[in-house]
Amino acid sequence: MLLWLIFFTPGWTLIDGSEMQRDFTWHLRKVPRIVSERTFHLTSPTFEADAKMMVNTVCGIECQKELPTPSLSELEDYLSYETVFENGTRTLTRVKVQDLVFEPTQNTTKGASVRRKRQVYGTDSRFSILDKRFLTNFPFSTAVKLSTGCSGILISPQHVLTAAHCVHDGKDYVKGSKKLRVGLLKMRNKSGGKKRRGSKRSRRETSGGDQREGPREHLQDRVKAGRRRKQSGGGQRVSEGRPSFRWTRVKNTHIPKGWARGGMGDAALDYDYALLELKRAHKKKYMELGISPTIKKMPGGMIHFSGFDNDRADQLVYRFCSVSDESNDLLYQYCDAESGSTGSGVYLRLKDPDKKNWKRKIIAVYSGHQWVDVHGVQKDYNVAVRITPLKYAQICLWIHGNDANCAYG
């Protein structure tokens, strides 16, 4: 009942009076162009890195304030990207950035220094999605599970967005990523299998004739029994099934050079995202990519995401919480989460400018519970990597193969 209220209550009822006058609308904006310049063949990776659900100490929001704004050439280096294919071959694509307008640094939220050193803060506020009515429908059906232990989200008929560290540790690809698979949610019967077809026909043939030749009252009894079963079990059938996964191989993986640094420095948390192309297209409804607004333009300052937390085996876990701090590239938040949920797509629900309904879009990738350098002191945060105009343009290029459909986001 609580989930029903959350997802079917109009968005404006979740906003307090002070926010009623704010513009909570998706606004299309022109984004920079990212153009592929040249592609090089690289040596095949060894796929020997250990998968890490937590990145080593990184430069976070406070640390980034002390760094100079990256130049255009530095941005082009970070946004150049590696592609690793299912046969183990690897390429590097250099890009050029055009029509870039540098944006001012985001003002961070006050009072964000208070943290508790746990991934679950106080009372666990996560929801396990067990009801088939929710589990197999949008937006929960967009969540996927990676064979390396992370989560991800469907953003096209053939693409999954996830965290880069789920497949690459910054220096090499993790073990198991050469034969990476993605699990899409499906429901299975209690018996664990499908009903065999043709069983009625076989029974008729075994009995030696058409069952319509039997007494009429037997047929009526069977009809009545079927009705009783339907009436008694109809309300329970929704929750009878258990979630399982239909696994699909990954055709290729794209990772920004800002993360895949090799031996040329530490991976930058700002670029902890990757795109997976599936070998087979799916038929599920996917979630569109959006550009992350500021906290002030998020209803209640709230974000949402669903993933497969390791402490709840094979259960899809949903949560929503407020954002506590932001920079141009990162969001800090108090969402309760455990390892396994990293790579989940963080989304918002805002008004569609052309319609009266509210629409969900992905605005960040959950990077997980990270140790962040704050003025030389290590502190732990739950971090999400924002979809900026540049990252939107890059991911759009990965999906379409060119920038023709990536002018606005």
UniProtKB/Swiss-Prot annotation:
Segments forming domain Peptidase S1: 120-404
Cystine residue pairs: 150-166
Pfam families with a match to the protein in the record: Trypsin
Species name: Macaca mulatta (Rhesus macaque)
InterPro entries attached to this UniProt entry: Glutamyl_endopeptidase, Peptidase_S1_PA, Peptidase_S1_PA_chymotrypsin, Trypsin_dom, TRYPSIN_HIS
Domain of life assignment: Eukaryota
Region listing for Disordered, in residue ranges: 188-246
Entry keywords, A to Z: Disulfide bond, Glycoprotein, Secreted, Serine protease homolog, Signal
One GO cellular component term: extracellular region
Glycosylated residues, chain numbering: 87, 107
Protein name in UniProt: Inactive serine protease 35
Record's subcellular location: Secreted
GO terms, molecular function: serine-type endopeptidase activity
Leader peptide range in chain numbering: 1-17
Family: Belongs to the peptidase S1 family.
Ranges annotated as biased composition (Basic residues): 188-203
Compositional bias annotation for Basic and acidic residues: 204-224
